[in-house]
Amino acid sequence: ELTGRIELDPTPDHLAASLPEGATVCVLGWPDLAGEAVLQRGDLRVLAIDTAGQGSALVRRIQRAAEHDDAGVDAEVIDPAGIAAAVLSSDLVLVEASAASLEAVLAVPGSRAAATIAADEGIPVWAVVGVGRRLPAAAFDSLVERVGDVRVAWDAEAEVVPLRSVSHVVCEAGVVERDDADMRPECPLAHELLG
């Protein structure tokens, strides 16, 4: 049942329909669901933080789509050193979760900095949490431990973003305020996957 829900995940459609008209949106890397959503819109400006070279790939994809579209999305690659300036120039920050728990999301590097800066400045931060990404606490913690198992913390492939830095959650149910979001696990804990 969960597999079918993942394949038919309405999260990108909810996001595309809910993004403010003409908004400047900051994304990190190439988020699959948020990337799909911004491609559905022709009135946005996307500031893509070039996390692991993925922001530039997203911008190239947006530009190719714009060549076939009259409106097209305006997209710009931002070096990670410019993350604060990009966030402060945005109307909205999208942080896409590769996994989520009741208290946090796991996202690409730079996401925590972007969310913290935005929250501190009163800029909305929407966590994009697709179907199948809400995990039991033990599974989430195990995943965090695995991606963080590097020689130095700044080499980790992902980082934890506390939900307290998020204003809204975009999910299967639509765009909801953080405190109203259902972040309960979507699947039982598989003990054999831990460790």
Where are these regions (language model features)?
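N-terminal active-site beta-alpha-beta segment that forms phosphate/nucleotide-binding
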Residues: 1-77
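Conserved phosphate- and dinucleotide-binding cores of soluble alpha/beta proteins
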Residues: 52-195
